[in-house]
């Protein structure tokens, strides 16, 4: 944790969920009571097909809604894509950009991530930008080099604590059940914090840094209590209300 920075818990449903899944969203909304909600901000990034219905359920009150990706152009002949403006109209306030699955499967470069961040800003969305190394890069002691490249290439000038959130998600831990040690997470988050402070000044020091990579109820307390960890980006555990709420409840103890 970091003093004076409000924690942020984000759930990423990925390509999971149909209308039947909205019952879990209702349960999450009911479980984040007013007293718990004061301790942190919550975001759920549902599939684009559920955004409008999810907004009708949540109303943008206790839980924020986000998209999982957006195109770098505002409109155009891009079959199957979705623009940041479309996400905004459907009820989103945030959008995940540069997730490791997008960077690896779809070969999205830092330049593309940067362009998507700028598109998100044009639409009035907060960009949740993901960075992280592969297992090979970690074994080769290139973690900080990779993060430096990604941070410099993916973040446009003008980043503030109001328009971006950064999630560190080691690629080797995403969806694998493997989790970085708290010492590894502390080292990386301190490094990212330093980079943000150096580039963006005092405003950069306020940018929230989330950890993402097989966060679950059994390891949430250790991870969320780590220095410079201001929250979590949660994948599979966000699909079940009981798991997501158990992670959120950690903030009652910190």
Swiss-Prot record:
One of the GO biological process terms: glycolytic process
Name of the molecule in the record: Triosephosphate isomerase
CDD domains per the UniProt record, alphabetical: TIM
Residue spans crossing the bilayer: none
Alphabetized Gene3D superfamilies for the sequence: Aldolase class I
E.C. code: 5.3.1.1
UniProt subunit comment: Homodimer.
Signal peptide (from-to): none
Source organism of this protein record: Bartonella henselae (strain ATCC 49882 / DSM 28221 / CCUG 30454 / Houston 1)
HAMAP family: TIM_B (MF_00147_B)
